[in-house]
């Protein structure tokens, strides 16, 4: 048991086993899952959702392992995407709503594992600064689940395309065909919107892994980082 667990009043273990890699990809996904369960339970206890809704959401959660397996089977697409980063000076990850923190996770993993500069931004804030960074050939990863922000995210993506950015598009949307100006597109299995951040995180982590492999970086022990931080 860790020091922080011993000193805490309440602990929610993620039951994901030992995490060897410093980047903690498994721990992050485990934390998302546990937080989903916590929010679901709180909503039920507070009577914000009824028993039918609670049961339906639990049923959706049980579909997650199979959806993850399908996502992993698309690894070859991510290997092709990874080649786009070899000569890049940096990259940008864009998302709206619940996809914004996923963009931050994708950028962090790329920085940690491949030593390539990357930044995550809210797609809606592009015109307040980040758009100035777009130049010809810059890899821009756009995370666009089929939610209420989808059309606005596509509009932001068009702004990037118009300025020469190289789009790597990740979505769970099955309805629309991928824009011909998208360099690479990856569809993850569609699942309930509350669970989609988990599935959308996975390809970003795998992308960082494959970029690191191409650059001959140690994916388990990145330079200058340690599993346990002992100095503030």
Give the residues covered by each predicted segment:
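A SIS-like phosphosugar-recognition module
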Residues: 1-232
């Amino acid at each position: 048991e860790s020091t922080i667990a011993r000193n805490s009043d309440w602990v929610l273990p993620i039951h994901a086993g030992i995490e060897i890699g410093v980047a903690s990809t498994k721990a992050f996904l485990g934390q998302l899952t546990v937080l989903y369960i916590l929010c679901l339970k709180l909503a039920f206890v507070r009577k914000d959702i009824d028993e039918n809704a609670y049961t339906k959401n639990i049923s959706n959660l049980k579909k997650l392992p199979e959806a993850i397996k399908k996502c992993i089977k698309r690894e070859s697409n991510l290997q092709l995407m990874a080649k786009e980063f070899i000569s890049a000076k940096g990259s940008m990850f864009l998302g709206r709503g619940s996809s914004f923190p996923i963009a931050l996770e994708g950028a962090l993993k790329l920085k940690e594992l491949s030593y390539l500069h990357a930044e995550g931004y809210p797609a809606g804030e592009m015109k307040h600064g980040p758009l100035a960074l777009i130049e010809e050939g810059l890899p821009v990863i756009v995370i666009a689940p089929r939610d209420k922000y989808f059309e606005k995210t596509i509009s932001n993506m068009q702004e990037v395309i118009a300025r020469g950015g190289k789009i790597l598009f990740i979505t769970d949307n099955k309805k629309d065909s991928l824009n011909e100006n998208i360099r690479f597109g990856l569809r993850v299995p569609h699942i309930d919107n509350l669970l989609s951040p988990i599935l959308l995180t996975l390809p970003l982590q795998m992308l960082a892994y494959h970029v690191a492999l191409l650059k001959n970086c140690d994916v388990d022990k990145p330079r200058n980082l340690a599993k346990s931080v002992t100095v503030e």
